[in-house]
């Protein structure tokens, strides 16, 4: 049984798992959809025909996606849940600043303007929501620490410069099994850090990163690389001797390129 790896395919996989003589395959929806889009007609019937064609012509090894275990899915969803809470905390902080910005201290008299009851209510409500969000983030991080306490892989990931408890937890459960990657280039491409390439005849041009795969993991890797650039700049020359020259590091665009290269 084959289906596109779209939203909601995990329950189907779990339901078919106990059945004997049944093989379930989830195919990359981005690639199968691109095949159907070339005809200009996108229907469920055409999608089913494309999936059948892929299976009959031996395209399963090329288009099949990894099927993570239930525990790995739940752990990575916890990392996604924490990320959403962090974004919510940022929005609340911005809202508090927007409300209180007009009630700053007078630079000439040193007096603070009196806030109305409405503004006081909004500020208190936002601060209460912010405090509650902080507690939720703390609970999520406690769960992550508890789940990673007995895992042998997470401490090894944290030995990498720039990788902390949050990065290592997300990496651990998104990768799950490192043996499914042939080399580091395939792992980098899995997280969208591979280089775009365009070749036609004798021309071959490389561009930016592909930005496919997990956005969260790619963001955490870039943040870890930024932390390493800020706290351990002397280590950059170990990875990129020419790019990390002192004169080049003055260019912000150049520094951003080094950060992405370090994340790869």
Model feature map: region roles:
Residues 2-12:
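Acidic, metal-coordinating catalytic cores used for nucleic-acid/nucleotide bond scission
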Residues 156-159, 165, 169-258:
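Phosphate-backbone recognition surface of nucleic-acid-processing proteins
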Residues 11-15, 95:
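Phosphate- and divalent-cation-binding pockets in alpha/beta enzyme and binding domains
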Residues 52-79, 110-120:
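A short, charged helix-loop
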Residues 46, 52-70, 219-233:
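Metal-dependent DNA phosphodiester-chemistry modules and their immediately adjacent helices/loops
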Residues 77-156:
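Glycine-rich, often acidic, oxyanion-interacting loops/wings at catalytic, nucleic-acid
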Residues 17, 24-65, 114, 201-212:
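Short alpha-helix plus adjacent loop in nuclease-associated cores
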